[in-house]
Amino acid sequence: MKKYLLIAFSLFTLSSIAQSSKDADLLINKISKRYKKFSSIKADFTYSIESKAEKINEKQKGNIVIKGNKFRLDIAGQTIICDNKTQWTYSKEINEVNVQHYKPKEGIMKLDDIFTMYNKGFVSKMGEVVKEGGRELTILELAPKDKKKNYFKIKLFIEKNNQQIIKTVVFDKNGSIHTYTITNQIPNIKFVDGYFTFVAKKYPNVEINDMR
C-alpha cells in the first residue's frame, strides 16, 4: 500500500535551477495557503512507478477525496478509507477488509498532507518553466531535511497561472521513480463524515480482519 502514497516523475537536468530558494519558498507558501482554504478536495490521478533495477514499469489510475484529516483513496482494486483514527483497506478482488489504527508516521507521507506538506521540512529550489499539454508549468525541486527519508528528491510541476499542483515526482534512494499526475481536481465538495468510514453492510459477505 505504501507505494500508492508516493508521488513522482520527470526528466530534466539539475543545471536548469537558477533562481533563489527564497522565490521557491514564496511560491510554496502560496500553494499551501491556496489548498488550505479548501474544505475538501477530490482529485483524479494517474500513478506510475518505474524501476530499471527491478524491471518495473507500472501505471494505475485512481482517485482520492480529502477532507481535513480524513481521506478515501481508490486505486488498483483497493479502497483505503481513514477517519483519522481507524484505517480500512478493502480489496475488491477477494472481498476482504483489513482494519487497523491509523498511524500516519509509518508511511512515506500523510495523505492529508499531499497538497500542503511542501512548506515545511524541505530545502527548495526554483526550476525552469516548461510547457506540457498547452500549459505552462513551473518546476520546483525539493530535498527533505530529514536524510532518513526513503526518498531524496521531489519535483513539483505547478500550473503557472493558478498555482495548482499538476504533477509530483518522487525519487527513491533505491532508484525507483514514482509519478503522480493529477488529471482533475475539484475543491469544496460536500462530503458527510460517514463517507470516510467503512460500512460493512454495503459489502455482502465481506471478510473482516481486525488488526487493532
Language-model regions, residue ranges each:
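Sec-dependent N-terminal signal peptides
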Residues: Y4-T13
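N-terminal leader/targeting segments and the immediate start of mature chains
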Residues: S15-I56, N69-K70, K202, E207-R212
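Gly/Pro-enriched, hydrophobic low-complexity segments
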Residues: A18, K125-P204, I208-R212
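Extracytoplasmic
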Residues: F38-S40, K59-K61, G68, C82, ...
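Beta-turn initiation residues at beta-strand->coil junctions
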Residues: Y47-I49, S91, V169-D172
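An acidic-aromatic
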Residues: K61-M109, H178-T179
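Flexible, surface-exposed loop/linker segments and immediately adjacent secondary-structure boundaries
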Residues: Y102-E136
